[in-house]
């Protein structure tokens, strides 16, 4: 299975809607907004134009199979922190696509000079948690009953963080760049 990773463009709107609608609702809960709604995609694209979100997509034969975003607030007290959001099609999980998207987002974060990255996911998304931890993220918090699906069921949210500066310093000290 091959794919191309590139920047999310305005004309990718319909493909993103189709991709989001192909995912189970549970996979979208950590986002805070329902990507299956056109106005949410439009707001996302507006945030890209404003420079608050950098977004990458993975496409295969014209279909989206994954997405990664780096959400920042350059005007806040936490301008040094970026929030990473990752979505991978169910049939592409465990094959390296998520890792490739995250590594591409790491490069974007480095270009912005970010010191810390965070990621949120429901606590039962064990594959996602394992992937993020394999790339240096560590659990920092668990928010009980933080998100609620349309079925009314609440879910706990895990907050993971990656200290970019500490990892960079450790890598330099051990001769890894």
Which residue ranges define each predicted feature?
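A short beta-loop-alpha structural element at the N-terminal edge
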Residues: 4-18, 163
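Acetyl-CoA-dependent GNAT
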Residues: 10, 24, 29-91, 102-103, ...
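Conserved acetyl-CoA-binding loop-helix of GNAT-fold acetyltransferases
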Residues: 94-107, 111, 130-134
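Conserved catalytic-core motifs of GNAT/GCN5-like acyltransferases
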Residues: 118-121, 133, 138-155
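Short aromatic/hydrophobic contact patches that present stacked aromatics
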Residues: 4, 83-87, 118-120, 159-161
């Amino acid at each position: 299975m091959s794919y191309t990773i590139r920047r999310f463009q305005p004309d990718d709107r319909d493909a993103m809607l189709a991709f989001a609608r192909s995912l189970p609702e549970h996979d979208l809960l950590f986002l805070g907004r329902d990507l299956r709604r056109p106005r949410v995609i439009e707001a996302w694209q507006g945030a890209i134009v404003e420079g608050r979100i950098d977004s990458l997509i993975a496409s295969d034969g014209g279909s989206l199979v994954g997405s990664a975003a780096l959400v920042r607030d350059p005007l806040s007290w936490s301008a040094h922190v970026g929030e990473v959001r990752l979505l991978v099609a169910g049939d592409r999980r465990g094959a390296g696509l998520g890792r490739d998207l995250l590594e591409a987002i790491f490069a974007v974060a480095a270009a912005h000079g970010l010191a810390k990255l965070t990621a949120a996911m429901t606590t039962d998304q064990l594959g996602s948690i394992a992937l993020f931890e394999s790339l240096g993220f560590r659990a920092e918090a668990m928010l009980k009953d933080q998100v609620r699906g349309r079925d009314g069921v609440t879910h706990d949210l895990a907050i993971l963080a990656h200290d970019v500066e500490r990892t960079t310093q450790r890598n330099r000290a051990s001769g890894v760049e």
